[in-house]
Amino acid sequence: MIQMQSRLSVADNSGARELQCIKVLGGSHRRYAGIGDVIKVSVKDAMPRGRVKKGDVYNALIVRTKKGVRRRDGSVLRFDGNAAVLLNSKLEPIGTRVFGPVARELRSEKFMKIISLAPEVL
C-alpha cells in the first residue's frame, strides 16, 4: 500500500538506493498502489557512479510491499519492506539485475523481463 510521499528501497542495480513516490499512476484520484502497479518516483539517494542521479524522476514498478497481496486461495503474501524496480519511459527496467524475491502477480505481458531477472518468484 504505497501512496504519495512513501519511501521505497530499490530492488535492482540501477544505482539508486532510495525512492520516494510522487504520484500513483492510473486514475486522477487513485490514492494507493500495490504490488504490480506503476508509480512515478523521485530518486532520494543514489550511488556515486550509478546510472541514475539524485533528484531524477522515473517510473517504477512495485515488487514488494509490507501490506502484501491477497491470493485467490485466501493466503496473503507479505514482505519485510517496500521495494520497487526503476523503469524507463517505455516501462522497461533500467537495471540489469533484480535483487530479492518478487511476487507472481507481476507475471503479465509487460513485466516478464523483471520476472526472468528475479532470483526467486513467490
Swiss-Prot record:
GO terms for biological process: translation. Keywords: Ribonucleoprotein, Ribosomal protein, RNA-binding, rRNA-binding. The keyword Ribonucleoprotein applies. One of its GO terms (molecular function) is structural constituent of ribosome. InterPro entries: Ribosomal_uL14, Ribosomal_uL14_bac-type, Ribosomal_uL14_CS, Ribosomal_uL14_sf. GO terms for cellular component: cytosolic large ribosomal subunit. Part of the 50S ribosomal subunit. Forms a cluster with proteins L3 and L19. In the 70S ribosome, L14 and L19 interact and together make contacts with the 16S rRNA in bridges B5 and B8. Binds to 23S rRNA. Forms part of two intersubunit bridges in the 70S ribosome. Belongs to the universal ribosomal protein uL14 family. This is Large ribosomal subunit protein uL14. It comes from Dichelobacter nodosus (strain VCS1703A). The lineage of its organism: Bacteria, Pseudomonadati, Pseudomonadota, Gammaproteobacteria, Cardiobacteriales. The gene is rplN.
